[in-house]
Amino acid sequence: MSTPIRILGIDPGLRHTGWGVIEQSGARLVHIAHGVIDPPTDLSMAERLGHIFEAVGELARHHAPHAAGVEETLVNANPRSALKLGQARGAAMAALAMAGVSVAEFAPRQIKLSVVGTGTADKDQVKFMVQRLLPRAGEMKLDAADALACAICAAHHLPLQMKRGAA
């Protein structure tokens, strides 16, 4: 039996940053924990980013992941929103880097394809499949489901990246 690899998935957001931790042992995936980081709404932008940075750093210290998967930011019709989302993503990635965690980035379409089988799945379909793949995870918010989906995607792709020395 192979040594389990612990993976932290992050679904970044300024209001809600989802996170999920799984372990992969061979083809088997096991749920460890999940949740949502909710910075107080009365904080300034810089304070929210600091809150995300601190919380993700604490998750990395507490769960000691071998690797992390972070969802990439898509630039949509609202570039201002995409920029803000990118800042939250940067805060999370910086916290992971400071904790010495290898980070892999995945496009939303790639995550959905890995978990649901189609890159156009909606959030409810992703949550449904995450709960099927990780039955011990129980009930969760959509942001946590997206983060667990990112961790599952990382589990599917990290072995190949580790062989290449990219992770």
Curated annotation (Swiss-Prot):
Mg(2+) 1 binds at residues 11, 143. InterPro entries: RNaseH-like_sf, RNaseH_sf, X-over_junc_endoDNase_Mg_BS, X-over_junc_endoDNase_RuvC. Mg(2+) 2 binds at residue 71. It is found in: Cytoplasm. PROSITE patterns: RUVC. Keywords: Cytoplasm, DNA damage, DNA recombination, DNA repair, DNA-binding, Endonuclease, Hydrolase, Magnesium, Metal-binding, Nuclease. The RuvA-RuvB-RuvC complex processes Holliday junction (HJ) DNA during genetic recombination and DNA repair. Endonuclease that resolves HJ intermediates. Cleaves cruciform DNA by making single-stranded nicks across the HJ at symmetrical positions within the homologous arms, yielding a 5'-phosphate and a 3'-hydroxyl group; requires a central core of homology in the junction. The consensus cleavage sequence is 5'-(A/T)TT(C/G)-3'. Cleavage occurs on the 3'-side of the TT dinucleotide at the point of strand exchange. Homodimer which binds Holliday junction (HJ) DNA. The HJ becomes 2-fold symmetrical on binding to RuvC with unstacked arms; it has a different conformation from HJ DNA in complex with RuvA. In the full resolvosome a probable DNA-RuvA(4)-RuvB(12)-RuvC(2) complex forms which resolves the HJ. This is Crossover junction endodeoxyribonuclease RuvC. It comes from Hyphomonas neptunium (strain ATCC 15444).
